[in-house]
């Protein structure tokens, strides 16, 4: 079963961990792009993307899904399911 996981906050991390531990075929993790944070307003990775990268997942962070190229990349993963948790 091919899965694309979508989320951004720390709330989504346990769900992704369960899928990994159950050895599901998570093709990619979609998350929101980095956000400006702190006093210096430097860009900071969103929690799920940071976790997914540390676990070796392919991470996509599109600004919008209105772009046909973004949709084409999503389709290229040929997912059977999209799992969305706190996107």
What is each model feature region?
Residues 1-87:
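One-carbon transfer enzymes
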């Amino acid at each position: 079963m091919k899965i694309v996981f979508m989320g951004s906050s720390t709330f989504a991390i346990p769900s992704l961990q369960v899928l990994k531990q159950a050895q599901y075929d998570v093709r990619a993790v979609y998350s929101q792009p980095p956000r400006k944070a702190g006093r210096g307003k430097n860009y900071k990775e969103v929690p799920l993307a940071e976790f997914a990268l540390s676990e070796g997942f392919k991470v996509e962070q599109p600004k919008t899904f209105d772009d046909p190229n973004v949709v084409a990349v999503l389709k290229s993963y040929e997912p059977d399911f999209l799992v969305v948790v706190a996107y």
